[in-house]
Regions:
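Helix-start/capping segments and mature chain N-termini
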Residues: 1-108
Length: 108
């Protein structure tokens, strides 16, 4: 379920103030969805309790770390494996439309 990222501006800080995530995840579950994909003004941020990766043209992409993204432990490990395997990988700023061309999308 695609939702506006309504959280406070320092999402990179893990805190007990995850009410925005919880409320939107509850809405998603009520709508029959397992996860939400948040964005700010069309720019991908992260899932409700996860980071997002996608593949397009044989390259793996994930949004770069910013104040809108919590640097998850699993995200870090996935990036380490990608680099160890020398796979094509880019961190950057990606929009909702980038996912329309993706061959696969996953949350960590």
């Amino acid at each position: 379920m695609l939702v506006d990222d309504i959280r406070w501006q320092r999402c990179d800080i893990k805190s007990t103030s995850l009410l925005g995530n919880v409320l939107q995840m509850n809405d998603a579950k009520s709508a029959g969805c397992n996860e939400i994909l948040m964005h700010k003004n069309g720019e991908l941020t992260e899932g409700g309790a996860s980071n997002i990766f996608f593949v397009k043209n044989k390259t793996i992409f994930t949004p770069e770390l910013s104040s809108n993204i919590l640097p998850g432990i699993t995200r870090h490990q996935v990036i380490k494996i990608i680099n160890d395997k020398k796979l094509n990988f880019e961190e950057g700023s990606y929009g909702i439309d980038d996912l329309k061309e993706a061959s696969s999308i996953w949350f960590t």
